[in-house]
Design a protein with these regions (language model features):
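Terminal peptide-recognition signature
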Residues: 54, 109, 122, 135, ...
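Catalytic nucleophile loop of clan PA
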Residues: 259-282
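Chymotrypsin/trypsin-fold serine protease catalytic domain
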Residues: 169, 184-188, 192-257
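Conserved catalytic-core segment of clan PA serine endopeptidases
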Residues: 88, 92-117, 125-126, 146, ...
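C-terminal cap/linker of serine protease catalytic domains
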Residues: 280, 284-312
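Secretory targeting and sorting signals
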Residues: 1-29
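Acidic glycine-/aspartate-rich tracts in secreted/extracellular proteins
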Residues: 139-140, 157-160, 195-198, 226-228, ...
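Protease-domain processing segments flanking chymotrypsin-fold serine proteases, especially trypsin-like
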Residues: 26-126
Length: 312
């Protein structure tokens, strides 16, 4: 049976971290042997991407959670019954995700893979080049397979508006564990976008700090643009909770109570409360047998290596 996928602090933090919006690294360097796959976008494609994505085409884009159905189906197994079958009357769902106002550095990404147009969520992150965006690996590479084309980032998207314009990618980066093997444990990617009007993305919308090799079980605030029912992908949504380990598929990813749906993939996880913290994961996947839980990959040294590579 084909299973559906749902994907989609002020205290000092130990471990690898980068300061919010400063571009100044205070993190330990990534391992030299970190496996990274990089794709340079043809200049002509970058130049044409911003005019290619009309409002109508954006609206018709498909949530990219469908690209990881096979990986999750292999892990998603229901437990065996251990008692008598019992049924209780249904209640109307209470959504965990809540609508919030647009955040300048969080937005949507639009791209093409296999001839189809897709949409995900993403976030501007601090970097030496000032133009780096974080998202899910499956939002820029088939895992395994080709890299996306016509990739653009639209920060602070809401109801079709793009107050800061469209930012086309010049380079796409992801761990080889994702690009060669589709390993869901490494479902993170980074896009380097072109400056607009002589200004970098970070100078225009800001950029979140990022953190790697932190403890597990932290409290997070998650953001994304879920597009599958009951959401429509037109507004930013937020969830918050404490992360727990994956008890179903046995991945190294962590789960947080959150009912965001497809389209939210790639949205940032911030340590602590609100969107001003450091980013430490992305929305990646959910299990059909465990509704209302969003999983995100553990950001360790491999993903740190991909991040460092995106900075050139």
């Amino acid at each position: 049976m084909r299973r559906s996928i749902q994907a989609l602090t002020t205290a000092a933090l130990a471990g690898a971290m980068l300061a919010f919006g400063s571009g100044m690294a205070v993190a330990a360097p990534a391992p030299a042997d970190a496996d990274v796959d990089t794709f340079s976008v043809p200049a002509a494609e970058t130049a044409a991407a911003t005019t290619a994505w009309t409002p109508e085409r954006m609206e018709a884009a498909i949530p990219a959670d469908t690209l990881v159905l096979d990986q999750i189906a292999e892990l998603d197994t229901a437990p065996a019954p251990d008692g008598a079958a019992t049924t209780y009357a249904a209640d109307q769902p209470v959504l965990q995700a809540t609508r919030v106002s647009p955040v300048s550095h969080i937005g949507k990404v639009f791209f093409t893979l296999g001839g189809l147009d897709y949409v995900c969520s993403a976030n501007s992150v601090t970097s030496a080049n000032g133009n780096t965006v974080s998202t899910a690996g499956h939002c820029l590479n088939e895992g395994p397979g080709d890299f996306a084309s016509e990739f653009v980032f639209v920060p602070a998207y809401e109801n079709g508006s793009a107050p800061y314009g469209q930012w086309p990618a010049v380079e796409l980066v992801a761990p080889t564990q994702w690009t060669d093997g589709g390993d869901i444990n490494y479902d993170t990617g980074f896009a380097v976008v072109a400056s607009q009007g002589g200004r970098t993305l970070a100078a225009t919308v800001g950029a979140s700090g990022v953190s790697f090799n932190q403890s597990t079980g932290l409290s997070y605030t998650l953001y994304g643009y879920p597009a599958a029912s009951p959401f429509d992908g037109e507004t930013l949504q937020q969830c918050a909770g404490t992360a727990s380990r994956d008890r179903i598929g046995g991945t190294t990813s962590q789960g947080v109570s959150c009912d965001m749906t497809g389209g939210s993939s790639g949205g940032p996880w911030f340590i602590g409360s609100g969107s001003g913290g450091v980013q430490n994961s992305v929305n990646s996947f959910g299990y059909n047998t465990q509704p209302g839980v969003m999983y995100g990959p553990y950001w360790g040294s491999v993903i740190q290596g991909a991040y460092q590579s995106a900075q050139g």
